[in-house]
Structure formats: C-alpha cells, structure tokens
Amino acid sequence: MDSRTGENITAHQAENSVFIWEVPNPLYFKIMRVEDPAYTRTRIYHIQIRFNHNLRKALDLHKAFLNFQVWTTSIQASGTTYLNRFRLLVLLYLHRLGVIGINNVIRAVQFATNKSYVNTVLENHDIKYKFY
C-alpha cells in the first residue's frame, strides 16, 4: 500500500523492474537494532532495505523502505555478521535474476531467510510513489 495516499499498489507497479547492471549500488542495507529477548534462545534482527536514488528514479518511486523483522535461533551471529550474510544472499539472488524491483527484492529476502535457523520473518514496508 502506498503510505502517502493509502491506495493499494497495482500489480504493474509491484512488478515494474529495471536491469540490475543499469543501476550501480541499487540497495542500501541497514540493521536498525538487534533484540535478545530474555530467557529465550532467539535473536531478532530488524533490517531495513532502502532503494537508492537511481533505482527509485528508474521505478518512479518517491520513497522505498522495506523493513523486515527476522526471528532466528542463531544467537552466535552478531548484527553486522548476520547483515553481511543477509546482504550477500539477497544480492546473489538479484544478480542471478538480472532485474530488480519491489517484488523481486521481497522474493530475494524470502530466498535469504529460507534457512533452518530462521523461524519467522515479519514485513512492514514504507513505499511512496511519485504523483507526477
């Protein structure tokens, strides 16, 4: 859903893509925080994927922040270690696919989190399209 207008994103907008070699450094990965709930063997990584300016311009986006909460049983990996592994798998999927768009990034995250140590992935996205 477009967070500015409240309208649903159409299938055409969600599947709109650009070749990955046309946009240098298309994604910015940021770990927001790491939670270690007390008395559990889980670790929660809050990860944000941001589309860079050139990718947003190519896809007619005003803002695109994809927020993920990854619940894992991997308590050995620090935040930066997990983020590097996560980023590598997402970019590997996208480079093999050859195109990058909103739905393709979400599919790449599903590929990166399809591991035995990942319990749950929660998504909360902030996407705004250009009016003009």
Curated annotation (Swiss-Prot):
Keywords, ordered alphabetically: Host-virus interaction
A Pfam family matched in the record: Gemini_AL3
Residues annotated as signal peptide: none
Keyword Lipid metabolism assigned: no
Listed GO biological process terms: viral process
Statement: the UniProt record of this protein carries the keyword Membrane: no
Function: Increases viral DNA accumulation. Enhances infectivity and symptom expression.
Similarity remark: Belongs to the geminiviridae replication enhancer protein family.
Subunit structure: Homooligomer. Interacts with the replication-associated protein (REP). Interacts with host proliferating cell nuclear antigen (PCNA). Interacts with host retinoblastoma-related protein 1 (RBR1), and may thereby deregulate the host cell cycle. Oligomerization and interaction with PCNA are necessary for optimal replication enhancement.
Name recorded for this polypeptide: Replication enhancer protein
Organism: Bean golden yellow mosaic virus (isolate Puerto Rico)
Lineage, opening ranks: Viruses, Monodnaviria, Shotokuvirae, Cressdnaviricota, Repensiviricetes
